[in-house]
């Protein structure tokens, strides 16, 4: 898949500064100016909270992993965008997960 993506010319002005495989992408937006973009979810890290019923560390983990990925490419984190995808809504669980997002 990565090989196929490398062959696509999008015609966009910005280009990736780093090769594929890094935890975050750095896009050139002007000469000598880039912006780092990263995304990461909690994935399998939800297994323990589901077993213990304690979700208050999930939000911390979301933020920490995204910030860490941006730092790993030498960028300074300035903003985080995340989302919460759930099958069913539970206000208490939602509040626990989001407690440390803000």
Show where each model-derived region lies.
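A glycine-rich phosphate/pyrophosphate-binding beta-strand-loop-alpha-helix module
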Residues: 53-102
């Amino acid at each position: 898949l990565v090989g196929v993506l490398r062959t696509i010319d999008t015609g966009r002005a910005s280009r990736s500064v780093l090769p594929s495989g890094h935890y975050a992408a750095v896009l050139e937006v002007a000469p000598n100016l880039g912006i780092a973009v990263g995304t990461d979810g909690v994935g399998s890290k939800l297994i323990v909270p589901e077993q213990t019923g304690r979700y208050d560390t999930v939000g911390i983990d979301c933020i920490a992993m995204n910030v860490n990925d941006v730092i790993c490419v030498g960028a300074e984190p300035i903003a985080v965008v995340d989302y919460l995808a759930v099958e069913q809504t539970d206000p208490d669980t939602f509040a626990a997960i989001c407690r440390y997002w803000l």
